[in-house]
């Protein structure tokens, strides 16, 4: 029996919506990364993007455990000497709700062209409304 390998043209992608209200950041991110890769499907193939589209609503109501609200730090650099910026999870959630979730999921996906294609299937919204109702997304409980 030959090993099955999915073809990019044959992949069927579903749309799912996740309500992140009072959900823990890492638990949501790991499940989302798994579904973006397509590892939940029997036809998963490592070198083919077999994942689904994921819509996350209420990303502003995401939470972290313990004291990570103040202790978890995110860094970025301007490219100039001494140009490092540091922010906490709490400040990032206030200014850019959902960016912490996007960064967490992106870190769990493969690096390279395949990972970049996978992260494009993630749609994060701070509030409960999203513009993807035409795709008739199924509700996904985590």
UniProtKB/Swiss-Prot annotation:
Q: Which GO terms describe its biological process?
A: negative regulation of translation; translation
Question: Which keywords describe this protein according to UniProt?
Answer: Ribonucleoprotein, Ribosomal protein
Q: Does the keyword rRNA-binding apply?
A: no
Task: Name one molecular function that GO assigns to this entry.
Answer: structural constituent of ribosome
Which cysteine pairs make disulfide bonds?
Answer: none
Show the Pfam families listed in the entry.
Ribosomal_L13
One term under GO cellular component: cytosolic large ribosomal subunit
Q: Which residues, if any, are the signal sequence?
A: none
Task: List, alphabetically, the CDD domains matched.
Answer: Ribosomal_L13
Family membership noted in the UniProt record: Belongs to the universal ribosomal protein uL13 family.
What role does this protein play?
A: This protein is one of the early assembly proteins of the 50S ribosomal subunit, although it is not seen to bind rRNA by itself. It is important during the early stages of 50S assembly.
Instruction: Fetch the NCBIfam families from UniProt.
Output: rplM_bact (TIGR01066)
What interactions and quaternary structure are annotated?
A: Part of the 50S ribosomal subunit.
What is this protein identified as? Large ribosomal subunit protein uL13
Protein source organism: Cupriavidus metallidurans (strain ATCC 43123 / DSM 2839 / NBRC 102507 / CH34)
Give the encoding gene's name: rplM
